[in-house]
């Protein structure tokens, strides 16, 4: 079983590092980006199995990245967890409206994020048959 490849995109480098360390402890491969434009480019190039996106980022916010991912056939099925300080009901609704699979607000518990990733990975099916990941 291949390890899960996860894109983490947030403009706060210490948050990216915190997430990266916790995901890599699970044996997963982590690709990082620090703004929305770079995140979108890395999704297209790296083809991750899952994305963790902040909302408030330079150049392109996380909602714009999410909307773009959902419009493109190559990326429309990639699961997305929004991880953001935007915690009002309207923000959460907007995230789900644009196609987020889960919405986690900051401050967050890194192990809760790990749990979300496991839950999504276990239920993800891209139509090519059963997909299994080594979840550690």
Name each model-derived stretch.
Residues 27-34, 42:
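Short hydrophobic/Thr-rich beta-strand motif most characteristic of the beta2 strand and flanking loop
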Residues 17-25:
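Charged docking surfaces used in two-component/phosphorelay signaling
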Residues 108-118:
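C-terminal output helix
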Residues 57:
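Receiver (REC) domain active-site loop signature in two-component systems and cognate sites
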Residues 46-52:
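Active-site beta3 strand of CheY-like receiver
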């Amino acid at each position: 079983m291949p390890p899960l490849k996860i894109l983490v995109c947030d403009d706060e480098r210490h948050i990216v590092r915190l997430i990266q360390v916790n995901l890599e402890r699970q044996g997963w491969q982590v690709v990082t980006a620090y703004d929305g434009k770079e995140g979108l480019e890395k999704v297209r190039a790296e083809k991750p199995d899952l994305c963790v996106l902040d909302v408030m980022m330079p150049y392109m916010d996380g909602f714009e990245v999410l909307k773009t991912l959902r419009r493109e056939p190559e990326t429309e099925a990639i699961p997305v967890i929004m991880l953001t300080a935007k915690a009002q009901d309207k923000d959460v609704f907007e995230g789900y409206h644009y196609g987020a699979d889960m919405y986690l607000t900051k401050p967050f518990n890194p192990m809760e994020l790990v749990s979300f990733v496991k839950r999504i990975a276990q239920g993800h099916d891209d139509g090519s048959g059963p997909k299994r990941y080594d979840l550690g």
